[in-house]
């Protein structure tokens, strides 16, 4: 399943039917293009070793911060999050004050009318209705997409009630810019605790993929006070202090300035080794030692 990237202010019970989200697809050359590379190699190794079908839920959204994956109730208790709520509210109000809300409503009405005309023409010809029906959510305030808790509300909460074996969490790069590293020490551990509550499993295995080395600048690679290394340290400390978690190192999987490793296999393989050893209890030579 690939979950469409989206952020919403309120927790959702289901995925919107119009974009086909939440539908299982069998892995094939036609469907694999939408899958995370790391998740693919992770699932491939599990499948080969366990010889059972492996279901992967790909809920990924580039550029998010840890606070986008934590419940609003939890975030409201964190003093470091107050500036982010204030900033979001100001941006949303500015969008309304500039008349963008009314303009978006007019665009939606226009686009919907045009789509309905095409649908009627297709029906008259006995043809299938055209895809791409305008989604009202796409005409909402764009700042909602990055609302604190937004990604959790739209992409994780509809999965509530699903029984899962564990989670891999690969995020942190965007928290290394500006002052975004400051709340990370509180928000990142909260991701784990909140997800365990959502899936009603206080011991839910949680694989922490440490952010890769993604810059040729010496300061970002070797200066332990640089924010990228502060994030890695916090990921390490969270692993040390949180039971039933694993730390998957990806620092050496990158060889150029790209923010994500272009070598997906080592990261997926290491994640699978951790899962096989700790989640599935396979100890027959599968090495998964953490750093």
Describe each region flagged by the PLM:
Residues 1-291:
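Cell-envelope and extracellular/periplasmic
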């Amino acid at each position: 399943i690939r979950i469409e990237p989206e952020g919403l202010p309120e927790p959702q019970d289901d995925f919107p039917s119009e974009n086909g989200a939440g539908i299982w697809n069998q892995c094939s050359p036609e469907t694999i293009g939408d899958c995370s590379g790391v998740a693919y190699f992770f699932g491939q190794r599990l499948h080969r070793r366990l010889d059972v079908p492996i279901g992967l839920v790909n809920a990924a959204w580039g550029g998010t911060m840890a606070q986008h994956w934590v419940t609003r109730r939890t975030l409201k208790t964190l003093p470091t999050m107050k500036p982010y709520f204030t900033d979001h509210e100001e941006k949303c109000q500015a969008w309304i004050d500039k008349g963008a809300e009314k303009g978006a409503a007019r665009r939606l009405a226009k686009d919907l009318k045009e789509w309905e005309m095409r649908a009627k023409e297709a029906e008259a010809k006995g043809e299938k209705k055209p895809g791409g029906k305008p989604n009202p959510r796409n005409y909402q305030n764009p700042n909602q997409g990055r609302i604190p808790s937004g990604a959790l509300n739209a992409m994780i909460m509809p999965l509530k009630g699903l029984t899962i074996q564990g989670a891999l969490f690969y995020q942190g790069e965007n928290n290394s810019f500006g002052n975004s590293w400051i709340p990370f020490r509180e928000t990142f551990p909260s991701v784990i605790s909140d997800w365990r509550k959502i899936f009603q499993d206080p011991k839910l295995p949680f694989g922490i993929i440490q952010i890769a080395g993604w810059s040729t600048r010496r300061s970002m690679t070797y200066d332990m006070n640089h924010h990228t290394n502060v994030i890695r340290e916090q990921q390490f400390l969270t692993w040390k202090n949180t039971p039933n978690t694993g730390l998957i190192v990806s620092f050496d999987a990158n060889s150029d300035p790209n923010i994500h490793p272009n070598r997906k296999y080592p990261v997926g393989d290491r994640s699978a080794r951790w899962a096989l050893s700790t989640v599935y209890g396979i100890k027959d030579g599968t090495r998964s030692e953490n750093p």
